[in-house]
Amino acid sequence: MPADLHPDLDALAPLLGTWAGQGAGEYPTIEPFEYLEEVVFSHVGKPFLVYAQKTRAVADGTPLHAETGYLRVPKPGQVELVLAHPSGITEIEVGTYSASGGVIEMEMVTTAIGMTPTAKEVTALSRSFRMVGDELSYRLRMGAVGLPLQHHLGARLRRKS
């Protein structure tokens, strides 16, 4: 456990660090695409992890997306993800986690989505994370622009530090 990590985060301590890898996205309204991703989990000694994510195009490194926020642990086995996107969207996801035998799994669904007047309509999001050793994978499902919740993104990341 890192020094000064809040004790409520002990089970999620293996997430701390920088993760990088590749993912793929699809949605009925866009062409399928691949991306490079970096995710950083850090902490400030309070009962939440700081989360920062950014992606770029595989072909030329063009920035694609970013999001930042906090992964809160209100009580053992429960998580709350609070995120802001530069596309004008904020989201709150609530769910559960389990941590055992070197495996961490999280399942979350949105309970609230905020949008600026110019943001594209997003009505639902859900995420699944799975960390095994030095590999972190996730799936993101999205309901947007009049379509129901469905697969949108998936990636496999490896620990860099």
Curated annotation (Swiss-Prot):
GO terms for molecular function: heme binding; metal ion binding; peroxynitrite isomerase activity. Heme b binds at residue 152. Homodimer. Keywords: Heme, Iron, Isomerase, Metal-binding. Binds 1 heme b group per subunit, that coordinates a highly solvent-exposed Fe(III) atom. SUPFAM superfamilies: Lipocalins. This is Peroxynitrite isomerase 2. Forms a 10-stranded antiparallel beta-barrel structure able to accommodate a hydrophobic ligand in its interior. In fact, this fold hosts the heme group, which is located in a wide surface cleft. A motif (GXWXGXG) lies at residues 17-23. Pathway: Nitrogen metabolism. It catalyses: peroxynitrite = nitrate. Its EC number is 5.99.-.-. It comes from Mycobacterium ulcerans (strain Agy99). Its cofactor is heme b. Heme-binding protein able to scavenge peroxynitrite and to protect free L-tyrosine against peroxynitrite-mediated nitration, by acting as a peroxynitrite isomerase that converts peroxynitrite to nitrate. Therefore, this protein likely plays a role in peroxynitrite sensing and in the detoxification of reactive nitrogen and oxygen species (RNS and ROS, respectively). Is able to bind nitric oxide (NO) in vitro, but may act as a sensor of peroxynitrite levels in vivo. It comes from the Bacteria. Belongs to the nitrobindin family.
